[in-house]
Curated annotation (Swiss-Prot):
GO terms for biological process: bacterial-type flagellum assembly; bacterial-type flagellum-dependent cell motility; protein secretion by the type III secretion system; proton motive force-driven ATP synthesis; proton transmembrane transport. It comes from Salmonella typhimurium (strain LT2 / SGSC1412 / ATCC 700720). The lineage of its organism: Bacteria, Pseudomonadati, Pseudomonadota, Gammaproteobacteria, Enterobacterales. It is found in: Cytoplasm. This is Flagellum-specific ATP synthase. Gene3D superfamilies: 3.40.50.12240. Probable catalytic subunit of a protein translocase for flagellum-specific export, or a proton translocase involved in local circuits at the flagellum. May be involved in a specialized protein export pathway that proceeds without signal peptide cleavage.
Length: 456
């Protein structure tokens, strides 16, 4: 009896060992519909944001396409692929990434940490620079909980951007969030490159979202340069990738900046562009049936913008900071575009680039009259503020009467402010212009302003 029991227990142990070698059970659903950008699947219960794998045929081989749950209707899941969908068949099997399909899947974990410095990655953390995957064991979720506003450090310190017009006339504070409003071809990328090279920050995170592939390479190699790239992390999600990957790229760039901020470092975050991020969300929202609102943008777009922007800024007292510059494309130089209007309301200031100035060869083409830094008054002295006000008054007076002065119709002495503007105009114009490879730090910028207004 004992021998038989021993034999039976041994057989049971062998059976258990063989069972352990079998592959884990994978729940899967089936693809039932493909319309435009969205695929529909049934048979799985997964939360929004969960990652799925769809089987596709590539000749005799079966390959996998990564997708994400962007919505559901009853038992139907709406999926948006992150890759090319060619070869996907009706009824193709759909797996949850964790293999269970029970809704218990955790959020995405993407690489973080100092090992990312000098690297160029896509929105999913995969290398685009031809190098191996980042050598880091540190990972983190893509989305973090909202920051308690009462725990943020106030904006108290000036950020030296290396650009004279910004330093002196549109002073930016460490932890401020600024918008760079510009149409196409007015020097936006060049100005961003100058700030990336010359800004006094520990780390630079660049998010190139929805841009042309040629512009991505040009920005990294020529505008950012080797010096800027050494202390930078570049996340690139060009225009030809999935809208989901473009949105994820913006969130990932922000998450990397948050990670460095939490390490006590001061980060410069450059996002080019916030408009392409909004357009990517519009593509997704319209594809899953959300009704359009203002100029074709669904309401979810205007909810996503502040959720992204509010993640930047100062950390807790004694911690690091994220100073962010978001570019906003103004189509046809329309400052009332809905995205531009929404961004202006949620940012801490805006720098407007003028096509008129760019066409006149005036670089950087910053329209000082239309630009503002909301944190500036808390950062500068009364004397500095008085000089800035006088500078803007003289600039505005000259611009309003430029035609009269040009044709000789203005009689000197009619307007004391205009008389002073005409006298100082060469100095004002020279102050606002700066070479691409010329650095003007904070002290030099103030000294240049002092030379124009020594008695103010």
């Amino acid at each position: 009896m004992t021998t038989r029991l021993t034999r039976w227990l041994t057989a049971l142990d062998n059976f258990e060992a063989k069972m352990a070698l079998l592959p884990a059970v994978r729940r899967y659903g089936r693809l039932t519909r493909a319309t435009g950008l969205v695929l529909e699947a049934t048979g799985l219960q997964l939360p929004l944001g969960a990652t799925c794998i769809i089987e596709r045929q590539d000749g005799p081989e079966t390959k996998e396409v990564e997708s994400e749950v962007v919505g559901f209707n009853g038992q139907r899941l709406f999926l948006m692929p992150l890759e090319e969908v060619e070869g996907i068949l009706p009824g193709a099997r759909v797996y949850a990434r964790n293999g269970h399909g029970d809704g218990l899947q955790s959020g995405k974990q993407l690489p973080l940490g100092p090992a990312l410095l000098g690297r160029v990655l896509d929105g999913g953390g995969k290398p685009l620079d031809g190098l191996p995957a980042p050598d880091t064991l540190e990972t983190g979720a893509l989305i973090t909980p909202p920051f308690n506003p009462l725990q943020r450090t106030p904006i108290e310190h000036v950020l030296d951007t290396g650009v004279r017009a910004i330093n002196a006339l549109l002073t930016v504070g460490r932890g401020q969030r600024m918008g760079l409003f510009a149409g196409s071809g007015v020097g936006k990328s060049v100005l961003l490159g100058m700030m990336a090279r010359y800004t006094r920050a520990d780390v630079i995170v660049v998010g190139l979202i929805g841009e042309r592939g040629r512009e991505v390479k040009d920005f990294i190699e020529n505008i950012l340069g080797p010096d800027g790239r050494a202390r930078s992390v570049v996340i690139a999600a060009p225009a030809d990738v999935s809208p989901l990957l473009r949105m994820q790229g913006a969130a990932y760039a922000t998450r990397i900046a948050e990670d460095f901020r939490d390490r006590g470092q001061h980060v410069l975050l450059i996002m080019d562009s916030l408009t392409r991020y909004a357009m990517a969300q519009r593509e997704i929202a319209l594809a899953i049936g959300e009704p359009p609102a203002t100029k074709g943008y669904p309401p979810s777009v205007f909810a996503k913008l502040p959720a992204l922007v509010e993640r930047a800024g100062n950390g807790i007292h004694g911690g690091g900071s994220i100073t962010a510059f978001y570019t906003v494309l103004t189509e046809g130089d329309d400052q009332q575009d809905p995205i531009a209007d929404s961004a202006r309301a949620i940012l801490d200031g805006h720098i407007v680039l003028s096509r008129r100035l760019a066409e006149a060869g005036h670089y950087p083409a910053i329209d000082i009259e239309a630009s503002i830094s909301r944190a500036m008054t808390a950062l500068i002295t009364e004397q500095h503020y008085a000089r800035v006000r006088l500078f803007k008054q003289l600039l505005s007076s000259f611009q309003r009467n430029r035609d009269l002065v040009s044709v000789g119709a203005y009689a000197k002495g009619s307007d004391p402010m205009l008389d002073k503007a005409i006298t100082l105009w060469p100095q004002l114009e020279a102050f606002l212009q700066q070479g691409i490879f010329e650095r003007a730090d904070w002290e030099d910028s103030l000294q240049a302003l002092d030379l124009i207004f020594p008695t103010v």
